[in-house]
């Protein structure tokens, strides 16, 4: 049986690659916003004509040619998905608004597809369109067939890559053995075989730290340097 599995790693691009990643993020965001604006204008004026394609936008804005063309195509598909969800919620009585993408978003990302082995992993490097081989912190092996990757950048100026692969999953053999599990407060669980599993309370401790950091953030003045620094601390706890 096959299923999709994602492998996420910290990217370590060089300075030139950072510039191109930032440019790709900006171009995808620009194209999404331009198409959304065009779509809204046509909707208000009841214009049924088709939207301009990313190829037509490249003629108007030549600097769009500098980045991965597949990433731009995916940005257009993201807008289509957003509009489909918008009308689906509208029909079900859940009015919502389509928002423009902001460069001030704490996390920006773009997605690209593996076409003719354009994306591949070699040791601790991954080959990406336009970027070439980019180093990453290889914490585990990437298995299966690479379908797509998502490159992201967070508020801490850290770059990450999520590699989506199609992997073969082995079906576990059926067993007639049974075990009872009792979840508790002091111990995480106790089995019918009298096995005790301790409760490290990682989630509880993390939630307390996050709550304290968010409380401090709420007291910081909007737009201030101290608020921006506190936002980074909150985001670091979310990682």
Stretches with model-predicted labels:
Residues 1-239:
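Nucleic-acid substrate recognition interfaces
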């Amino acid at each position: 049986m096959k299923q999709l599995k994602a492998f996420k790693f910290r990217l370590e691009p060089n300075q030139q690659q950072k510039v191109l990643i930032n440019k790709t993020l900006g171009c995808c965001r620009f194209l999404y916003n331009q198409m959304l604006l065009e779509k809204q204008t046509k909707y208000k004026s009841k214009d049924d004509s088709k939207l301009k394609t990313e190829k037509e936008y490249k003629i108007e804005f030549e600097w769009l040619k500098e980045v991965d063309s597949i990433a731009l195509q995916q940005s257009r598909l993201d807008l289509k998905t957003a509009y489909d969800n918008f009308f689906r919620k509208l029909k079900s009585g859940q009015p919502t608004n389509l928002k423009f993408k902001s460069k001030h978003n704490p996390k920006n990302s773009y997605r690209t597809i593996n076409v003719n082995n354009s994306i591949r992993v070699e040791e601790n490097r991954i080959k990406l369109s336009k970027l070439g081989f980019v180093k990453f912190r290889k914490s585990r092996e990437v298995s299966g067939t690479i379908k797509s990757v998502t490159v992201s950048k967070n508020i801490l100026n850290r770059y990450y890559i999520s590699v989506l692969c199609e992997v073969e999953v082995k079906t576990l053999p059926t067993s007639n053995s049974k075990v009872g599990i009792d979840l508790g407060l002091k111990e995480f669980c106790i089995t019918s075989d009298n096995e005790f599993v301790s409760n490290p309370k990682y989630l509880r401790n993390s939630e307390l730290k996050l709550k304290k950091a968010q409380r401090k953030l709420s007291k910081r003045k909007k737009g201030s340097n101290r608020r921006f620094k506190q936002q980074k601390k909150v985001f670091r706890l979310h990682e």
